[in-house]
Amino acid sequence: MTKGTDIELDEIELGFAGFFLNRTSRSGILRGGVIGGKAQAGDYKLDARFRQEDLVARIRAISNRKSQITVTGMDALELLMTVGPGLPEKCLAYLDPPYYIKGSQLYRNHYQHGDHETIAHFAANTKLPLLITYDNCPEIRQLYRGMETTEFSLIYSTHTARPKASEILIHANVKIPNKPTLTRGGTISSSAAERIVF
């Protein structure tokens, strides 16, 4: 049993609560607030990203590969340095660190500048095929100067009319199409994914 502030939850209940909060918070971030706002007066309501049939299908797909999945609480770089040397040749590491500019407002465990520097140093020196996504800001461009980058924009899936967020994709030891095509929800289209070369 896991103790909350005033209730006890077993692991399944706690896992579902975390899953529900992720799917009903803006961009999956608790501090981002509830989709539609507390008054639910927005165009999109609390359940905009909680499409049950789709989520059940995703969970089943993950469950089908559970023997290939390991969950760890290790720091991302510690994990990569530990398992990286033993990874298969055709393996891709993907890092999605906390945003540089708004990280402290969005995440409880946001990075300090030194943490971002450590990631950049790792990226510049690793032999692993590596993708990193960040907010596109001067500080990140400076940290990753000299590395291959691709700038792109995402349209948030809960509101197509919302302004685009400027992002940057940093890549090391991998060749990427000039302009990856991102589909709704932020995934690379299959045609672009097929052209990524290790």
Task: Specify the residue positions occupied by each region the protein language model found.
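Class I S-adenosyl-L-methionine
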Residues: M74-L92, Y99-F198
